[in-house]
């Protein structure tokens, strides 16, 4: 009897929700840029007996007994992350990317310090200074963005704002930016004003690990990331820095912002890092980028405008203004057709965020499933048809059937029960 069989017997209501989600994943196309499918091995580690163990502290420096085996799991995660990214010091305990960012900020800043981060409206992240987030409430935030014409980061503007505001920290990285980030130039800008540079690579960590995006390791003083998204691990966070900053980071994570680490999640992180160290992982990331470029070109052929004119990484932003559609309406219509994306503001968007003029697409999950350029072109055709006729329910139903047929040829990894 499988664990899911046990759950179906004991808690059928919850089991039904999980079974329904598995079915949704199996029969639909996942194009949310921050999502991916983990392997059976990652699922096995995260669902293991390590979930029973409390382990406050760090390997061989715990506040509880009986930690000799969870120490092995954390040591493996740290060792593999160091090897994967070339970092001197790694903390794998943050429960999320947001908590990793919080820990770095608390370790280096005082309340009210000035911080320069990429505006959320231009592709940044909540934890980079949004007024509703802890970062925006704790520090004096100044924002930078993209050039109105190129829709790429305006590094001259970043330098000008930094010179004017004299921030203690500059944060780079993004949640909806399709171009490479020049970490070396940002470090120069930071050095010129005496600022710390923190790089949040949550979205592009897999590309960095595979050598397909410039690495901020050894450039930024602090690098944070999530462990899911392009890394295909469990949902969690991680901090990388030089050895000299390691002790301060560790004591800020614990006991500063967290108590007991999630040892089952850390074990799953170790599994994912081990998978990312394999030669086939780089090929996977290469195909992710190729698929994103093909999808961008194919959507352009459907009459849609791609923000910044294309993509260098795993995601792209589509401006729906040429087809008189909103991101909110397009997301809903595509969802009815079995294609999952998210509405997203575009730079200088006149519409409110919950309506938005754009859609964000990402190729990591579909590529994990085995989709290639031909499937990307077919997806673009479906997207074009749907956004031009948002109210056409029969068209959405027809495409949903075609999507289901396509997905049947590409089983979802990590779901042997449901294949």
From Swiss-Prot:
Pfam families of this UniProt entry? SHMT
Determine the domain of life of the protein's source: Bacteria
Q: What is its EC number?
A: 2.1.2.1
Against Gene3D superfamilies, the record matches this protein to: Aspartate Aminotransferase, domain 1, Type I PLP-dependent aspartate aminotransferase-like (Major domain)
- Residues annotated as site: Plays an important role in substrate specificity: 228
What GO CC terms are in its UniProt record? cytosol
Cite the GO molecular-function annotations of the record: glycine hydroxymethyltransferase activity; pyridoxal phosphate binding
Residues bound to (6S)-5,6,7,8-tetrahydrofolate: 120, 124-126
Cofactors (names): pyridoxal 5'-phosphate
Q: Which reaction does it catalyse?
A: (6R)-5,10-methylene-5,6,7,8-tetrahydrofolate + glycine + H2O = (6S)-5,6,7,8-tetrahydrofolate + L-serine
Quaternary assembly: Homodimer.
Name this polypeptide is given: Serine hydroxymethyltransferase
The family assignment reads: Belongs to the SHMT family.
Has UniProt tagged this entry with the keyword Cytoplasm?
A: yes
Q: Which organism is it from?
A: Herpetosiphon aurantiacus (strain ATCC 23779 / DSM 785 / 114-95)
Q: Example GO biological process term?
A: glycine biosynthetic process from serine
Broad EC category: transferase
N6-(pyridoxal phosphate)lysine PTM positions read 229
Keyword Cytoplasm on this protein?
Answer: yes
